[in-house]
Amino acid sequence: MKCSFHIPEKYQWASTLFVHVALIAGVAVYTVFGALSMQWLESPDRVRALLKRELKPVESLPPPPSISGLPDRITRVYLGEELAILDPGVHECLERTILTLFHDTKCDPYSFEHLNIELIDRCYAEANVPIPEGYGGQPRKKIKNKEEEKDVIDETPAEKWSIGNSVIFAFTVITTIGYGHVAPETFEGRLFLIFYGVIGVPFTLLTIADLGMFLTRFLKNLLTMARRFAHYLVKLYQKAKKQRNKSQKTSPVMPDSERSEVWNTGKEMKEMSMRTAREPGEGDEIEVIENGNDENGKEEDEEEPENNEPRKTEESIALGITFTCYLVAGAKILSVYEPEMDFFKALYFNFVTLTTIGLGDFVPKSFDYLLITLIYIGIGLALTTMAIEIAADLLKKLHYIGRKMENVGQAVVWFGGKKMTMKSLVKHLGDQFNIPEEELANFDMSAFVDNAIKVEKGEIATLRKPPTPPVVFRERAFSFSNVRNSSESALKYVDDNRFSKTTQPTIYTVIIHETTRTIDTLHNLADAIRRDPSIPRLDLDVHYLTDMSAPTSFDENYLRTYTNARRK
């Protein structure tokens, strides 16, 4: 037993809105999930533990070779990352030294060019690295108590996998931007990133495409409103110009009373002339249209721009203007709260990000406004999707120029969330209008689509066939004038004196014309039947005369009985 959940029609809009909101909320939750996961997988403690396992202990190093001519002192080169693991005080020294240099030089480019980095080298040279006594080194200085150890750890610089950097990393992964400012270093982090991207990239791109469709519809509505407003302004201008021309052509000013009388008289004469020239009811309608007072005409003129969809050129121009304004406005906003970006750098960052180039030379640093930055990037990616869609349509046109349409019947048409092939759609449409199956089987769909495109371009007026004369079903009585011979000059009635059995031996079908004599003739015929018992009785009940679907002028039963009697 199948259970189906039916949403009431009045709540359909709510379900559609819920789908859009759910997609956006899903991307947000997925981004936070990825950020927290990467922050845990790439935590400094786990990375240090892994690096310590990979590095060989100093005590396990072999003793120096006792070869003549070699120095007694052996030097081993450590990387900065290895020194930071062996002695966390290196970062403390570097941070303090760099801040001092910034303060002394005041960020002057010339001073930076001639900067002496001896102080920085001293931090590495004075690193407290445990070296065996056999190599001439000194043992590592131990921390006296836990409080001093806590102070050293708290004074270390901010970790690269902070919550802000983790969110930016997760968002740039699923949007395929990929700044590259941070990257996973552990096996677990890299493995998680693969599965995270496999699921998140399609889901996020689907959400961005859905948002792009919403923005496309919104942009089309704006274009339609702009076109309607322009049409309205043109009509106002034409109306004002027409009134100005009329005022210039009028005679000298007359009193208001005389002017109204002349106007009313002219209007009445026009109405009378129009009514005499046309059938009743037709003149009024035409006159109203001529006077420009047809309200339906106004509504059609106003609704006409709504029915015409914006052309691709208009969409392209509008999208280009919108995208440019969006870049400039975003650059102005980002330059306010991003410390490393001025207006041009913010504009450069927006372009590189929204086009998914993602060089990573500039990364958002203001984590307090990170939500605004991510929303801006998401809407910008939707605008980029719109541009890609328009460009794809243009490329399709260029690709199929000069090619003949093939396999039109298998083209898929989408109706909301359901799809149907063109062939099935035409078949169901033919069944709806009772078109014979032979015609549907012989229907050339490619030619039909080709002609329909020509109609849209204006090359063909219409695909409608010329109308055939309609079959008229007569609702009035069937008259003898429709069946009599051309040589017969007049109709013959039962009560007519010209009708004689001697001169007209043949039995004629007594058909009575639609005249005022019909009822009298029937009554006379009934009286004749009563006088002559040999003639069967003609039923003149009101039920027979009123309940027939179409009025008739003779009794078929009587005619059949009367004819058989004459033949005998």
Swiss-Prot record:
Gene transcribed to yield this protein: twk-9
Subcellular location field: Membrane
Transmembrane regions listed in the UniProt entry: 16-36, 191-211, 317-337, 370-390
InterPro entries hit by this protein: 2pore_dom_K_chnl, K_chnl_dom
Entry keyword set: Ion channel, Ion transport, Membrane, Potassium, Potassium channel, Potassium transport, Transmembrane, Transmembrane helix, Transport
Mode of membrane association: Multi-pass membrane protein
Origin: domain of life: Eukaryota
Chief localization: membrane
GO biological process, one term: potassium ion transmembrane transport
A GO term, aspect molecular function: potassium ion leak channel activity
Intramembrane extents: 163-183, 343-363
Keyword Methyltransferase annotated: no
SUPFAM superfamilies for the chain: Voltage-gated potassium channels (SSF81324)
Acidic residues bias spans: 297-307
A Pfam entry, by short name: Ion_trans_2
Tissue expression per record: Expressed in ray A-type neurons and cell bodies. Also seen in head, pharyngeal and phasmid neurons, and in coelomocytes.
Family: Belongs to the two pore domain potassium channel (TC 1.A.1.8) family.
UniProt function note: Potassium channel protein that may be component of regulatory network that controls ray development and function.
Listed name of the protein: TWiK family of potassium channels protein 9
